[in-house]
Amino acid sequence: MNIMNTEQSQNSIVSRIKVFEGQTNIETSGLPKKPEITPRSLPPKPTVSSGKPSVAPKPAANRASGEWDSGTENRLKVTSKEGLTPYPPLQEAGSIPVTKPELPKKPNPGLIRSVNPEIPGRGPLAESSDSGKKVPTPAPRPLLLKKSVSSENPTYPSAPLKPVTVPPRLAGASQAKAYKSLGEGPPANPPVPVLQSKPLVDIDLISFDDDVLPTPSGNLAEESVGSEMVLDPFQLPAKTEPIKERAVQPAPTRKPTVIRIPAKPGKCLHEDPQSPPPLPAEKPIGNTFSTVSGKLSNVERTRNLESNHPGQTGGFVRVPPRLPPRPVNGKTIPTQQPPTKVPPERPPPPKLSATRRSNKKLPFNRSSSDMDLQKKQSNLATGLSKAKSQVFKNQDPVLPPRPKPGHPLYSKYMLSVPHGIANEDIVSQNPGELSCKRGDVLVMLKQTENNYLECQKGEDTGRVHLSQMKIITPLDEHLRSRPNDPSHAQKPVDSGAPHAVVLHDFPAEQVDDLNLTSGEIVYLLEKIDTDWYRGNCRNQIGIFPANYVKVIIDIPEGGNGKRECVSSHCVKGSRCVARFEYIGEQKDELSFSEGEIIILKEYVNEEWARGEVRGRTGIFPLNFVEPVEDYPTSGANVLSTKVPLKTKKEDSGSNSQVNSLPAEWCEALHSFTAETSDDLSFKRGDRIQILERLDSDWCRGRLQDREGIFPAVFVRPCPAEAKSMLAIVPKGRKAKALYDFRGENEDELSFKAGDIITELESVDDDWMSGELMGKSGIFPKNYIQFLQIS
């Protein structure tokens, strides 16, 4: 009976198809089921966009299509027998979207869609919904359809639908974007089980990921159709209602993502018209990848693509930090940069010769101001230089008392200072008063009231009544003599020395650069080349560009700072080498640089001499130079003119000290305090000239200007070098300041930690006199350290 019913239905379908072909689209509207077709005609709009209008399919459309299929299934069979080739390709193209989007396009493709391999699962559904009589007929139909479809498959590859749908779009898309679209698909993709029901499709998807973008071929289409046809009979008896529910789900919404993926590989193109929903499913594909092909998942592939193509994905942000270390070796940071206020550019650094480099070395000993400025720029200076308040409060020794009347040096160092002597013991009863003992020397600072004076004793200051002290040097005489003090007079600039005015600020950027400020006066010491000078400013020496200054008096030609050769007349006289640079502050003073050779003309006094350098003559301090040639011993003794201000006794002592070349010298190992008037007191480290050996235990010697006897066990003989040095330098040893000392009176010598003090002379057990930068004065012994003469 089933066969008879099938033949009758086929004959009726054939007749209907013939009538249907002769009719126009208007006739199709005259069918009795027009009201059901009308809602289905709405989806044609999404079908125009080939694959993206998949949003149109809805469960209502499925029901309508099921009713329509019940009336058209017979027609589909007749068309397959008659061999209507144009319809089958349209069927396959619209089968996957559940026959909703593409059916409204044309009535013919809508009829043929029911022949798709998925229709066998829906045929029974439609018939069961229509009537129970037609339920047995769908089972044989899939078999006939398989044969008809397989016979028509040879013509199917020529169908232009497959290449038109997806490949041209996705060929231009990048691989990274395609994989990103996959990542978007899985969360919203409901029809995952449909893809699981077609394992062949999954395998094709896996293999397609590895392929490059080939165009779809007919064989691939045949394989896909054949595989679906084979699987259809198994699905007919299987789960019909679950498939219907899955079709009802909004699977077509993921159609755009499916279209992007198959375009890249070529094996999945046949799945575009048939299985768009399964393709977006990422989890089953990833599982299939890991189990079947054993290759990376899509997410990992996307990460690899982003890492391999950082320019496209923007993941190359981590690369810039690696770039900075590269140019460090190749790049050279500009050594010199023009200051902010400087219009001219800095010239290239000068090329200095070996001699110039040697001369540029910082001297071991410098002036106090030089040493102070250099120490401020170094960490050593920070530790050594301290404020006076810190010095007195923390670790500096206490100032010793001033020399009292009767002391051998009292008249020399205290008479010029306004001071008085306490007549009685004074105990301060009110704040601001000074306490002292009888006989203490009080230095008068100012007169506060009619009967009170502001005085100082050591570190303490306070008021003292006039009746409690005896004034030795009043304040009025001190004030009258003060204007004559050259230390308080304004010292003009040496207009005769080569100098220049700074036009622009020049910040020192190298060790040898001289930091200059606009408006300063810089003394020119050497013209290195046409672009650079070497000069002195604020007791600092360095090089600076010539275009930053305006030269007032230039260095004469031939005197480019290079040490002049000693002329013939130079050899005849005495010479000395400059130990430090010296800039003359008076017109009659001689300016010179460190290391220059000065021709001695005459000695002005004990501290000054007249000399000649670079054709210029002037006076200069002797403690800035070092003798080069031994002073002549025959004829007029040079040293005899060196100390014209000394007394006759001191004169003879100095001459004997120098002339007695075979004199023996010793160094004090321990301090010795005189117990009688004939004893010679000295400190540890002092160098004493032995005048006579009294016996094996006692000797007579001279220390500075004092003579006396001392025990031989307290000293040791000096080496030959020390003897020769002491013979040449009569002033003896040098001392290095350990702490800052600020003289509170004019007779005191102020210095800073690190200064080198010369012309040492012992005043008493606590005080010494010395010279620094042309100034002499007294200072406490415990503030200095004696230097060994080498």
From Swiss-Prot:
Widely expressed with highest levels in heart, skeletal muscle, kidney, liver, placenta, small intestine and lung. Expressed at low levels in colon, thymus, spleen and leukocytes. GO terms for molecular function: proline-rich region binding. Interacts with ADAM12. Isoform 4 and isoform 5 (but not isoform 1 and isoform 2) interact with ADAM9, ADAM10, ADAM15 and ADAM17. Interacts with SH3GL1 SH3 domain. Interacts via SH3 3 and SH3 4 or SH3 4 and SH3 5 domains with SOS2. Probably forms a trimeric complex with SH3GL1 and SOS2. Interacts with SH3YL1. Residues 336-351 have a biased composition (Pro residues). This is SH3 domain-containing protein 19. GO terms for biological process: cytoskeleton organization; positive regulation of membrane protein ectodomain proteolysis; regulation of cell morphogenesis. Residues 342-358 are annotated as: Interaction with SH3GL1. The modification Phosphoserine is found at S65, S369, S762. Residues 21-196, 241-374 are annotated as: Disordered.
